[in-house]
Amino acid sequence: PLQTPSITIANNAASIASGSNGESVYTATYTMQSSDNTGVIPFSVDFKDLANNEGVQIIAVINDVDGGVTFDKQAPSFTSVTISSDNSNNTALAIVNDEITLELTSDEAIITGTDPTITINGNNASVTRNSTTSFTATYTMSSPSDDGIDGSVIPINISAYSDATGNVGTTLTATTDGSFVTYDKTLPTLPTVTISSDNTYDHLAASGDELTLTIASDENIN
């Protein structure tokens, strides 16, 4: 039988959950704190028998038959987030039926079953897991559901993802490289269209006169 041992976990005094003088089985517990160091959690056990003979101190992790426990308090994050459109003229613009694509790369493995929840303009995107650290999200713009942001940058939201330890990542609402896509569903118009002749009377034309058609649009025309 032993005296109640002195036990530390993560260099902090542990609570002896069971066992007392004269018993041979003890359980020690400690709740990890945000101030504790990351990495393999050290522990130590100092003990004596009832005759006060001191045993050889046990320390982590060489004496841990389970291989130790690693403390991870770092939440995962996406170090690369880019957005683009499959618009045939400009990948930074989108019209109705254009597909928006988000490409994401995380700094550590995202646990299976906690793939990020991603919305594009408030609509749930289809998320594909390419690897434990790589994801692709897509959404096709539609009318009238997306009409409210006509002429605006398409908002994104990335949330509800975690690593193997259970650390939850921060919600993201912006790309990492400054990329963006602007939604434009308004058809261009030509509010001003005039025709004239270089004839003395510009509303008349004779053989050899040059006609000029002047067009003004309400936005840039490709």
Q: Which positions does each model-derived feature cover?
A:
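Non-catalytic beta-sheet/beta-sandwich ligand-binding modules that flank or precede catalytic cores
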Residues: 1-222
